[in-house]
Amino acid sequence: MPVLREEQHRIGRIGWLRAAVLGANDGILSTASLVLGVAAAHATHTNVLVAGVAGLVAGSMSMAAGEYVSVHSQADTEQADLKQERAELKADDKGEHEELAAIYIARGLDPALAKQVAEKLMAHDAMGAHARDELGISKTLTARSLQAALASAGSFAVGAAMPLLVTAIAPEAALIPLVSGTSLVFLALLGGFAARAGGAGVAAGAIRVTFWGALAMAVTAGVGALFGTVA
């Protein structure tokens, strides 16, 4: 019997990687924007730092809760579809065999071979075959709510800590340029890392994240300066 070589593919990381990159990006961007907005409104250094810490804590909890609820909803939908598929297999095994064969025919197999493949797969694991080929549910892409929530919250906290650390040590007079400059560097590094981990172009990933980060921080700082002037 031939020994199968186990291969590692990037799609296996997609669940936790997406949550981690999103969390870290949000952590850097939202905290830096919050700090810049409050600082632009002429708040004291202490008040700016307190606002940043509050943003870190609130953001981490919000990311964890939102990610958990979102991914859990996906998992609930998957389970409902699997339950329906089990019932259909029990009620009409022949019809499900024809349905599976039709899927393989649509993918390019000739009808005789498609029926044979469907028969063999259903004899081995009917539910697994239908989950994978009809519903698009596999172990690799199965929703994992707790894993996604922890990855999202942890990465948000790590990302938020970066501009917060700069805020803590930067002199008040240079706080805005230092926080904005270092945060853009952090975002560029994160964008490059995420692109590399996903197998995409590093430069394009870094530029994309940095552009939107710069835009968000500029808008937030502008609003803060406007309210500071009005006040």
Q: What are these regions, as identified by a protein language model?
A:
Residues 173-185:
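Structural signature of hydrophobic alpha-helical transmembrane segments
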Residues 189-214:
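Interfacial loop-to-transmembrane junctions
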Residues 221-231:
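Juxtamembrane boundary at the C-terminal end of a transmembrane helix
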